[in-house]
Amino acid sequence: MKVFIILGALNAMMAVGTGAFGAHGLEGKLSDKYMSIWEKATTYQMYHGLGLLVIGLISGTTSINVNWAGWLLFFGIVFFSGSLYFLALTQVRILGAITPIGGVLFIIGWLVLVIATLKFAG
């Protein structure tokens, strides 16, 4: 599905940008703890952006329905990485409760991809 290729590419692009911003723009402005949180958000955004690219490519060439997996990964990025970026910049922990929701969405998204692939292969 074209939307997942676009979302994947945009998220990978944003991960490169946020990584560069963290390394150059935030250096010395955030404590090591919050820099580590920023880097984790960037890393997970990149991994799952690449996952979205793969889902977009798979959905365009087979009959596997991976749309649910794609949307779960996308919203996982929003909740997980988004809340970590916010936490790193503001040190406001209230949105920290949202981070695990994003992690669960990632896990379910990958599981849905496995199940869809097994159904197709089976």
From Swiss-Prot:
Its main location: membrane. The chain crosses the membrane at residues 3-23, 46-66, 69-89, 98-118. Pfam families: DUF423. It is a multi-pass membrane protein. InterPro entries: DUF423. One of its GO terms (cellular component) is plasma membrane. Signal peptide: none annotated. It is found in: Cell membrane. Keywords: Cell membrane, Membrane, Transmembrane, Transmembrane helix. It comes from the Bacteria. Belongs to the UPF0382 family. This is UPF0382 membrane protein SERP0230. It comes from Staphylococcus epidermidis (strain ATCC 35984 / DSM 28319 / BCRC 17069 / CCUG 31568 / BM 3577 / RP62A).
